[in-house]
Regions:
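Short, Lys/Arg-rich, polar N-terminal cytosolic tail immediately upstream
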Residues: 2-27
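A structural signal for multi-pass alpha-helical bundles of membrane permease subunits
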Residues: 24, 30-299
Length: 299
């Protein structure tokens, strides 16, 4: 009888006998993948590049055919014309939008994290019914709330006041649901029970255990919320009827109405309005990518 002995090699990822770690496997993208990603990136970036091209040229050259593909030398002049335009008041619009979007973002992330933690890890009477009620608010079209909200702003005397843009949107049903789902996936029950055994209160558990784990999701929610209310036009256009107290999107609408044939000035104003979003994305790039990747893996 013949016996054959098979000697298994070391499992993948273990240290070799010489002490060197096994090299990680690197998956290289094929040429079709590289070409596809290059085309997708070009299509995504080209509108921004085209905005810079038009904003840096004269109004006459913006209508030329074939169009110029390289930036001109009038960007500073066009930007200065936008800033000097008292009708558009774009600097005031940027300030109001930053205050409104920033306040709404901070409030949404904070309350969504707390409520998400409560719905995910705490046990209390009526929890499921309350969660369903919050989810149902997401199914109501925004347009149905316009008239009741507008009448409420009149009763409160908040028309032409930035509070009318901020207060109705301080809490988000979507944000609560997102943070609840992320808490369920990222924070084990055993970790919370261990903190309770150590004598931590519910607030300390949230602050020192749950909140650090929610940072990637908070970064994604914060960016989405800030972008949404930075780009919001319809509601501010209704409640901020005073042209001297606009948001940035209302300022761009005024600029477009007053100078509907001056594409260079309109695109220069659009470029100014886009810069804050670009800066915020660059500052929080790592947290945003981490949140998207972790959400994709855990989902």
């Amino acid at each position: 009888m013949t016996m054959t002995t098979h000697v298994a090699g070391p499992p993948t990822g273990q240290l070799r006998l010489d002490g060197a770690a096994a090299a990680p496997r690197v998956h290289q993208a094929g040429p079709l993948t590289v070409i596809g990603l290059t085309v997708a990136a070009t299509l995504s970036v080209f509108p921004l590049y085209w905005m810079v091209v038009i904003a840096s040229r004269t109004n006459a050259s913006a209508y030329e055919w074939p169009p110029a593909l390289l930036p001109g030398g009038n960007l500073g002049e066009n930007v200065q014309r936008v800033l000097d335009n008292s009708d558009a008041a774009i600097l005031k619009g940027i300030f109001n939008s930053f205050v409104a979007a920033g306040t709404i973002t901070i409030s949404t992330v904070f309350f969504s994290a707390i409520a998400g933690f409560a719905f995910a890890k705490l046990r209390f009477r009526g929890r499921n019914a309350l969660l369903i009620a919050i989810l149902l608010t997401m199914m109501i079209p925004v347009q149905l709330n316009i008239v009741p909200l507008y009448r409420l702003m009149i009763e409160l005397g908040w028309l032409n006041d930035i509070k009318a843009v901020i207060v109705p949107f301080l809490i988000s049903g979507f944000g609560i649901f997102l943070m609840r789902q992320y808490t369920l996936q990222s924070v084990p029950d055993e970790l919370i029970e261990a903190a309770r055994v150590d004598g931590c209160s519910t607030w300390r558990i949230f602050r020192h255990v749950v909140a650090p784990a929610l940072r990637p999701a908070a970064a994604v929610l914060g960016l989405l919320t800030f972008m949404q209310y930075w780009n919001e036009f319809f509601w501010p256009f209704i409640v901020l009827a005073d042209p001297s107290n606009p948001t940035v999107q209302v300022s761009l609408k005024t600029l477009n109405s007053a100078y509907h044939q001056d594409l260079a000035q309109i695109f220069a104003g659009t470029l100014i309005a886009t810069l804050p979003l670009a800066v915020i994305f660059v500052l929080f790039f790592r947290q945003i990518i981490r949140g998207i990747m972790e959400g994709g893996v855990k989902g």
